[in-house]
């Protein structure tokens, strides 16, 4: 069967969402890990949101008129992110994932993004090896953490909802830590009411689009991240990602009763700066 790649359409949401669920379910079940996408309905909602968002580009793999895989690129910032790439488990071993990723790399080069990033499950060796062969470099081991809300406050580190007026300060903080901003994601989170900032000594010293699987946070120090994590009312998406090499923060999270769900890897091509501060990545990067 011949395969074609085409841009996604809103009417693809049902087929793509079900494949997203089945793909995550298949690999997680093989390794006896919890599902990051726990139901087809959640997969469909996720895909619908991305197909409807102007900051996302979608590629659909189709064989004989049937959707067999998809890839979504978050193009809302200077760094593009794969979020996610999935293939129908019944259609494996036909290089579908490879062709989708090659097409994504070609688009990133054509659109002159500074780089392309992704986060993949550490137990998914096939994904890890494919990405490495295509030029991605493993940069950071990540720990997905989950548990009950901590309800912890830190004197002098005040957490409040982020406002439109905070966007410039938050983006400047992100540029200091990462060398680029994530303004598109941040603006969406402010509009949705999920973003939070930490004020310390009269200045914004940390922000989070949420403390969740699909969200990121940036801070001058671990204390800002602890304040954001401590104030979170829940950890959406089955938990949040924490750089495992941040030993102080990882140890603190465990001491507060949070548990390790599984390990993931941050992988990059193109621009990458070693972070000059504290951060929590999203499942995109």
Whereabouts are the PLM-identified features?
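Intrinsically disordered, low-complexity, positively biased terminal segments
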Residues: 1-2, 54-58, 62-64, 88-89, ...
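Active-site rim helix/loop that mediates acceptor-substrate recognition in acyltransferases
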Residues: 17-58, 62-63, 67-70, 175-195
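Short, structured interface segments
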Residues: 128-152
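Hydrophobic adenine-recognition pocket in adenosine-nucleotide-binding enzymes
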Residues: 8, 85-87
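A short, well-structured alpha-helix characteristic of acyl/acetyltransferase catalytic modules
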Residues: 10-32, 152-154, 164-173, 275-282
């Amino acid at each position: 069967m011949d395969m074609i790649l085409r841009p996604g359409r809103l009417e693809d949401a049902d087929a793509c969402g079900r494949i997203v669920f089945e793909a995550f379910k298949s690999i997680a079940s093989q390794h006896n890990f919890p599902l990051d996408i726990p139901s087809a309905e959640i997969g469909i909602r996720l895909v619908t949101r991305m197909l409807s968002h102007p900051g996302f580009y979608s590629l659909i793999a189709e064989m004989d008129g049937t959707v067999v895989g998809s890839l979504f690129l978050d193009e809302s910032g200077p760094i593009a992110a794969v979020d996610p790439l999935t293939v129908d488990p019944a259609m494996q071993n036909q290089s579908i994932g490879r062709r989708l990723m090659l097409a994504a790399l070609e688009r990133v080069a054509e659109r002159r993004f500074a780089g392309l990033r992704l986060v993949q499950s550490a137990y998914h060796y096939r994904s890890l090896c494919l990405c490495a062969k295509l030029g991605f470099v493993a940069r950071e081991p990540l720990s997905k953490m989950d548990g009950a809300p901590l309800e912890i406050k830190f004197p002098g580190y005040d957490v409040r909802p982020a406002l439109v007026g905070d966007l410039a300060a938050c983006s400047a903080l992100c540029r200091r830590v990462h060398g680029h901003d994530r303004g598109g994601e941040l603006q969406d989170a402010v509009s949705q009411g999920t973003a939070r900032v930490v004020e310390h000594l009269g200045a914004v010293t940390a922000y989070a689009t949420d403390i969740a699987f699909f969200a990121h946070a940036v801070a001058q120090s671990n204390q800002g991240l602890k304040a954001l994590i401590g104030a979170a009312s829940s950890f959406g998406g089955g938990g949040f990602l924490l750089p495992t090499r941040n030993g102080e923060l990882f140890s603190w999270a465990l001491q507060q009763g949070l548990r390790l769900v599984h390990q993931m890897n941050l992988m990059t091509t193109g621009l990458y700066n070693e972070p000059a501060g504290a951060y929590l990545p999203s499942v995109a990067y």
